[in-house]
């Protein structure tokens, strides 16, 4: 039986339906390499209220495909931004950013830029965690103790990645033109810039998993549901 649907209103009883359809799509793609998964926006809050432990599509795909690691990449024609951490409270980010995490995820990004985007020698601009990238340890020690050791190991592995950059100036035009992808430490560090430049024209791509998955760059937008004013450009780009 189809769950009750009211335009513009969340219903936690729909959570099971949403999760089952997502899992069905993941399983189908695992069985056939000719298939890809395109997902629409869902309310994480609504899924959790429906009784599921759920932090996002990306994390669910990682779990269902038994992948060791996964990387969220938002991409448009102008800009690509990958995330070290995804959907977590800001006060958890610092403890979650480790040297191994950075190494693993930047290696995924480097490899997938080559294989999926045909970039022979990707140039990655990596953002620091703290304001001014820690300013020599005066505004935080994470750059010195965690991030720079990761970058040094990546460079030794022939990955073209920058030392941690101050996020407030890293998206200047000159660097933007020279960068194939940015690596941000948390969700709201890199994505506001991408969405300011390309909102509605960018897509979400899951890297590091054995299936192709793309998604729109926006949320459920309940405030405009049923009004006929939604912009579907991002949805069109997900299938290109």
Name the predicted role of every residue range.
Residues 1-57, 100-185, 189-197, 201-204, ...:
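Contiguous, glycine/small-aliphatic-enriched amphipathic segments in soluble metabolic enzymes
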Residues 1-7, 81-89:
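Short, basic/glycine-rich phosphate-binding loops at helix/coil junctions
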Residues 49-71:
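Glycine/threonine-rich beta-strand-loop-alpha-helix active-site module
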Residues 60-68, 88-114:
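Active-site glycine-rich loop that binds ribose-phosphate moieties when present
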Residues 73, 81, 88-97, 229:
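Short beta-strand elements at the ligand-binding edges of bilobed clamshell
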Residues 64-79, 209-223:
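Short, flexible loop segments at boundaries between secondary-structure elements
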Residues 77, 85-88, 128-130:
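Short, structured patches in soluble enzyme cores that scaffold and shape functional sites
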């Amino acid at each position: 039986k189809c769950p009750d649907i009211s335009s513009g209103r969340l219903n936690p009883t729909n959570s099971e339906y949403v999760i089952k359809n997502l899992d069905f799509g993941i399983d189908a793609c695992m069985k056939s390499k000719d298939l890809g998964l395109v997902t629409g926006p869902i309310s994480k809050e609504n899924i959790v209220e429906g009784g599921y432990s759920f932090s996002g599509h990306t994390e669910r795909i990682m779990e269902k495909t038994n992948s060791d690691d996964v990387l969220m990449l938002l991409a448009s024609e102008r800009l690509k931004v990958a995330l070290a951490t995804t959907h977590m409270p800001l006060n958890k980010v610092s403890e979650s950013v480790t040297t191994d995490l950075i190494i693993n995820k930047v290696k995924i990004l480097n490899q997938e830029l080559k294989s999926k985007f045909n970039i022979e020698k990707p140039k990655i601009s990596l953002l620091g965690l703290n304001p001014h990238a820690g300013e020599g340890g005066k505004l935080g020690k994470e750059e010195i103790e965690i991030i720079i050791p990761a970058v040094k190991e990546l460079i030794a592995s022939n990955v073209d990645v920058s030392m941690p950059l101050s996020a407030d100036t890293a998206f200047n035009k000159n660097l933007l033109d020279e960068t194939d992808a940015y690596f941000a430490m948390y969700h709201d560090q890199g994505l506001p810039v991408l969405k300011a430049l390309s909102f509605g024209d960018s897509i979400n791509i899951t890297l590091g998993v054995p299936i192709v998955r793309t998604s729109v760059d926006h949320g459920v937008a309940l405030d405009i549901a049923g009004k006929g004013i939604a912009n579907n450009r991002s949805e069109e780009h997900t299938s290109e």
